[in-house]
Regions:
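A short, acidic, flexible beta-alpha connecting loop/helix-capping segment that sits on the rim
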Residues: 256, 369-375
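Outer membrane beta-barrel
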Residues: 26-46, 53-221, 226-230, 237-246, ...
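Hydrophobic, well-ordered secondary-structure elements that form the walls
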Residues: 312, 332, 355, 367, ...
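Cleavable N-terminal export/targeting peptides
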Residues: 1-26, 169
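Outer-membrane beta-barrel "beta-signal"
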Residues: 380-392
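Surface-exposed beta-loop-beta
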Residues: 203-204, 208-305
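Extended hydrophobic-aromatic, low-complexity segments
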Residues: 285-288, 299-302, 320-329, 341-344, ...
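C-terminal closing repeat unit and adjoining cap/tail of repeat-based domains
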Residues: 352-368
Length: 392
């Protein structure tokens, strides 16, 4: 006959085993919330371009985002990212005013005015991923539908969680003439609505080969299509070493453009680019990125546009247990954007020098000196930009 103590012991062990098994099992759906908050200040001597750049100083919320990522099933992932961006101006502004009746015996009526338009609240990523291969295999095949970034430009596809240069393009307070601004305006970078196929192959635990093909409306973020054509993009990347990753992309952007005074719904402009990266943003040591982009703009003339940017940062970790800083990171960027290679005197060069202070791995304060110069006799712009960013 078993002793009561032994029975109790066996029962307890069984309960612990069942609890461990339950904890090891993944339940669906499961959703994780993350977010980011980024505050900016700038001061630039941009008075010569005030009609375009706005005031010479500004305090604003660059990004305030709550992100939801969920596994609906073992092979289905959903991701939604709304965003408030206070640095955006209202557009399509309309103002309507109403007046109360004039009081009996005379007096002043009450006038109420309301201004509406598109503000900084917008939907960024919103997509569903379906994996057609088993988890854990070296090769994985995915279908994505929804709104995502077009597969173009390595720095555009780098997360804004930790941008060593604060901005990908010229940013608020400067003229939008950096390479990222030019290719976004031409319809190649940033978000669009569509579908894409992606294949990932693990060379080893640290190296990945990726190929992506996508078809999109061509109109940009949250917009319906306007013609019977689609935009198409392709991008491939390969980690040639655990630290070095190279990539190339091609894009055909469609739209409706006036040609000889007649709307052309079959208009297409093209672009391509090559890029390379060493390390990752925020990792200890050196991080460097370079890319070259070339294409045609979305005008009847199809002017040749071109851009180059290179950046480097060195993340130095502080080892002292009493230090309130996690790391210090100096960074430098040069960006050259040309909106028409056939025209002399329209190229813009942006130089950015940054000193970053990591309060933790997820909180940074950066201060940058930026100088934007132009070919010809156009006055340059220079000044200071700061950013306080937190990811959670």
């Amino acid at each position: 006959m078993r002793s009561p103590k032994r029975v109790v012991g066996l029962t307890g062990a069984a309960v612990l085993c069942l609890a461990a098994v339950a904890q090891g099992q993944t339940t669906y759906p499961n959703v994780k919330l993350t977010g980011r908050l980024q505050e900016q200040f700038y001061y630039f001597n941009n008075d010569d371009y005030a009609a375009t750049t706005g005031p010479n100083s500004n305090l604003f919320t660059r990004r305030a985002r709550i992100e939801a990522r969920g596994n609906i099933a073992e092979n289905v992932v959903v991701y939604i990212q709304p965003s408030f961006e206070g640095g955006r101006n209202l557009n399509n502004v309309t103002t309507s005013c109403t007046s109360s009746p004039v009081p009996d015996g005379g007096g002043t009526p009450t006038i109420t005015c309301r201004t509406s338009g598109r503000s900084g609240l917008r939907l960024r990523d919103a997509w569903i991923d379906v994996r057609f291969t088993k988890e854990g295999t070296r090769g994985a095949f995915f279908l994505r539908g929804g709104q995502e970034k077009r597969p173009f430009s390595r720095y555009e596809l780098t997360s804004s969680n930790n941008l060593v240069s604060i901005e990908r393009g010229a940013g608020q307070g400067l003229l939008p003439r950096a390479s990222n601004d030019i290719f976004t305006s031409a319809g190649f970078a940033s978000h669009d609505v569509g579908a894409s196929l992606r294949y990932e192959y693990k060379l080893n635990d640290q190296q990945l080969l990726t190929v992506k093909l996508g078809a999109y409306n061509g109109q940009g973020e949250s917009l319906n299509d306007v013609n019977n054509k689609k935009s198409f993009g392709a991008r491939a990347t390969a980690a040639v070493t655990p630290k070095i990753d190279v990539g190339a992309n091609w894009y055909a952007h469609d739209g409706i453009t006036s040609v000889s005074g007649v709307p052309d719904s079959g208009f297409v402009n093209y672009a391509w680019g090559v890029d390379a990266q060493y390390g990752k943003p925020g990792d200890e040591g050196l991080y460097a990125l370079g890319e070259f982009l070339r294409g045609t703009d979305a005008t009847e003339a199809k002017n040749t546009i071109q851009g180059f940017q290179g950046l480097a940062a060195y993340n130095y970790r502080l080892k002292s247990p009493t230090s309130w800083l996690y790391a210090v990171e100096p960074a430098f960027r040069v960006d050259v954007g040309d909106p028409n290679t056939e025209v002399d005197g329209d190229r813009a060069t942006l130089i950015t020098g940054v000193l970053g202070f990591y309060l933790s791995s997820k909180a940074q304060f950066r201060i940058a000196y930026e100088h934007q110069s132009f070919q010809g006799d156009a006055p340059s712009i220079s000044g200071v930009r700061t950013a306080l960013t937190v990811n959670f």
